[in-house]
């Protein structure tokens, strides 16, 4: 990943997390920015571009979706679905965690066939989160 691409991915990551998680203080995301920036280049990341600019991305660690983010100006245009559909073409199973209060994301993944497998409290934020899973034959 080029440095400019990483800058764009990180801008989307920060903006999207702050926007989607109003129930978590912005400082949590800002304090984790450098750590995420360090691990993204070693992760499996697929991007969606519009006119040569990255507008969304999905990051994987094996079959685990570490994140699916779309720039705010490009949300509700099917970009997240396209990124997820692409990953589904070569991953037979997928899983991810989503905060219970992130209703929009929860509904999106439910529409895409994910089911709740477990729930736990995120020890870093104190927020309830769900483990969602998807099997290729579901």
What kind of region is each of these model predictions?
Residues 70, 76-89, 107-111:
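Conserved acetyl-CoA-binding loop-helix of GNAT-fold acetyltransferases
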Residues 96-107, 122-128:
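Conserved beta-strand-loop-alpha-helix junction that forms the acyl-donor binding cleft
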Residues 64-75, 98-99:
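A short, internal acetyl-CoA/4′-phosphopantetheine-binding micro-motif in the GNAT/acyltransferase core
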Residues 44-56:
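Conserved beta-hairpin
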Residues 11-27:
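Helix-loop element at the rim of GNAT/NAT acetyltransferase active sites that forms part
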Residues 84, 89-101:
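Conserved GNAT acetyl-CoA-binding A-motif
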Residues 1-11:
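A short beta-loop-alpha structural element at the N-terminal edge
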